[in-house]
Curated annotation (Swiss-Prot):
Family per record: Belongs to the DASH complex DAD3 family.
Species for this entry: Debaryomyces hansenii (strain ATCC 36239 / CBS 767 / BCRC 21394 / JCM 1990 / NBRC 0083 / IGC 2968)
GO molecular function ontology, one term from the record: microtubule plus-end binding
Name under which the protein is recorded: DASH complex subunit DAD3
The entry's keywords: Cell cycle, Cell division, Centromere, Chromosome, Chromosome partition, Cytoplasm, Cytoskeleton, Kinetochore, Microtubule, Mitosis, Nucleus
Localization: Nucleus; Cytoplasm, Cytoskeleton, Spindle; Chromosome, Centromere, Kinetochore
Protein's GO biological process: attachment of spindle microtubules to kinetochore; cell division; mitotic sister chromatid biorientation; protein transport along microtubule to mitotic spindle pole body
Region (Disordered), start-end ranges: 32-62, 96-143
One GO cellular component term noted in the UniProt record for this chain: cytoplasm
Chief localisation class: nucleus
Known role: Component of the DASH complex that connects microtubules with kinetochores and couples microtubule depolymerisation to chromosome movement; it is involved in retrieving kinetochores to the spindle poles before their re-orientation on the spindle in early mitosis and allows microtubule depolymerization to pull chromosomes apart and resist detachment during anaphase.
Subunit text: Component of the DASH complex consisting of ASK1, DAD1, DAD2, DAD3, DAD4, DAM1, DUO1, HSK3, SPC19 and SPC34, with a stoichiometry of one copy of each subunit per complex. Multiple DASH complexes oligomerize to form a ring that encircles spindle microtubules and organizes the rod-like NDC80 complexes of the outer kinetochore. DASH complex oligomerization strengthens microtubule attachments. On cytoplasmic microtubules, DASH complexes appear to form patches instead of rings.
Biased composition (Basic and acidic residues): 96-121, 131-143
Polar residues bias spans: 32-59
């Protein structure tokens, strides 16, 4: 059975993750052993050395737990940040749409006003023509 390219890529990513986790685990063990060697007091019995080793091991485990908690919190902050940025983009787009709609309304209103003025001018022109015709007819009748 052959793997699709995406399946092969996913498996290689899992393999890389496993290698990194193994490396991290070995580094933590090395850190624990270095810490244990540096903190062992000389002249103590082996029973007290075991207690110090357990304490140092516990400190490293607490450190790892704290790092895991920090990683989860950073992930949550990142998710919230992405949501906030997305919200800002949506709000900006909505504001731009409202501005464009307002400009369109203004343009439509300004396009309608000259038409009304032309209609008024045309009506006034007809009235003026009628008055001019009346004046001419009165002058002609008057003479």
């Amino acid at each position: 059975m052959l793997l699709s390219p995406i399946e092969a890529q996913i498996l290689s990513q899992y393999q890389l993750l496993a290698v990194q986790l193994n490396t991290l685990s070995s580094e933590v063990k090395q850190l624990n052993s270095t810490t244990n060697q540096n903190s062992r007091p000389s002249g103590k019995s082996s029973s007290s050395e075991d207690g110090v080793e357990a304490t140092n091991s516990g400190s490293a485990d607490k450190l790892l737990d704290n790092l895991r908690n920090l990683e989860m919190k950073i992930g949550l902050v990142y998710t919230l940040f992405k949501g906030a940025v997305y919200s800002l983009f949506l709000q900006y787009e909505e504001d731009q749409n409202l501005k464009n709609d307002e400009e369109q309304r203004r343009n439509d209103d300004s396009d309608e006003e000259p038409q009304n003025h032309h209609e008024i001018d045309a009506i006034e022109g007809e009235n003026n023509d009628d008055m001019g015709d009346r004046m001419e007819s009165q002058e002609n009748h008057g003479h």
